[in-house]
Structures are given as C-alpha cells and as structure tokens.
Regions:
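Iron-sulfur-cluster electron-transfer modules
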Residues: 1-139, 144-203
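The first long alpha-helix at the start of the GST-like C-terminal all-alpha domain
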Residues: 205-207
Length: 207
C-alpha cells in the first residue's frame, strides 16, 4: 500500500499513527472503549440478547448513548444473538468424509454474535462441497483497537489468534473469514505490519 502515492505514503496507516499520538496525549475516548469490547458484548448478548435488543430500540436510551458514549441516536446497532456461532458449531455434526480440502473458520465477533446465519451458511456450503471445517478457539481480530491507535491492546487481542491459527495453517488448513471485510484485511495486512511475531503473522496472511 502507498506505492501508487507520489510520496509512497500508506495514508490509512499514517492516519492510524496520528490517532495513536492523539490517544497517547488525551487517552481513549469512551466510545472507543465501548466499541472495542465486542467479545464481552457478544457474551452478554448470548444471555440477555432479547432484552438488550429491545432496550437498544428505545429512543430515549439511544439519546443517552449518543450523549454519553458518542453513538449517534439514529444509528441502529446490530442485534445480538442468543445462539452464537460458537455454540452452534460445537453442536454441529459434520458429515464430510474424504474431504477434498480443509479450512479453519475465523468467524469474527460479528458472525459469532450478530449474523450467525452467515457462519452457518458458510459451513453448510463448504461441507456440501466436501470441505472439512474446523472452528478453533478465537476472539475479536482486534481491529476496533486500531481505529484509535491503541497498539498495545491490539497486540494483546491479536496474539492469541495468531498462535491458534498458526497451529492450523501449519497443518495445511486454509483460513476462511466469515464476516466484515475489515476482519479479513486485519488478518491479511495488519497482523504482519503491527505484530512482532512476523513469521507466524505472515504465514497467516498468506493462508
């Protein structure tokens, strides 16, 4: 990235660095902290999803969220699922025999807690085509920590994913990301750039 720029600047990363300086000087904003807790919100949603979804539709609650957290009152938050993709996969029985290929599913926090059907459909299509699917332990890719330039939290969030995914790609598994393009970009581009375990992160990026 940046090669097409006159001065070969990777502008998105330049902005991230600028945000990092701002965060270092002023600290994290409340909405940055809130939006980075995707795994925690997903866990709460698995227990209290219907209640949280109902409350999020109340205009006065959205008004308070706008004033306190900084999430615009007209912004509709994605609904939380009580049956997470992780729960579904644990109970899922694969019928694949003699697979033609094998993949490790990186579900993303969005697929796990919000759009579970997306993950289910991906697995069903892959298995229909005789592809073995595994879903190892994982957490949010860490992208929400990059927006404010919180590199320490990003590394803390991403390192366990790298260690786990590396085990599988070393066995010949390919990575399938089900979820927002930001998550794919994070694994492919941000992990190699921002994490110190460069060999493992690069292997994941190429898978």
């Amino acid at each position: 990235p940046g090669k097409e720029h006159e001065f070969e600047l990777d502008f998105p990363k330049l902005m991230t660095r600028a945000q990092a300086i701002r965060t270092k000087d002023r600290g994290l904003k409340l909405n940055d902290i809130f939006l980075s807790k995707t795994d925690l919100l997903g866990t709460l949603g698995s227990y209290f999803g219907p209640l949280i979804n109902f409350v999020n539709r109340i205009s006065i609650v959205r008004w308070f969220m706008d004033k306190i957290i900084g999430i615009h009152k007209d912004r509709k938050l994605p609904e939380l699922a009580t049956l997470t993709f992780e729960k579904w996969f644990k109970n899922h029985k694969s019928v694949v025999q003699d697979p033609i290929d094998k993949v490790v599913i990186f579900g993303t926090c969005y697929t796990n807690s919000n759009d579970v059907d997306l993950g289910i459909s991906a697995v069903e299509i892959l298995e229909h085509n005789n592809v073995e699917c595994v879903y190892p332990k994982q957490q949010c890719c860490g992208a929400p920590h990059l927006s404010p330039g919180d590199f320490d939290s990003f590394k803390k969030q991403a390192d366990p994913n790298v260690e786990e995914l590396y085990k599988w790609v070393s066995k010949g598994y390919k990575i399938i990301v089900t979820g927002p393009p930001t998550c794919s970009l994070t694994l492919k581009s941000e992990y190699p750039d921002y994490l110190e375990m460069s060999d493992k992160a690069q292997k994941i990026s190429e898978s």
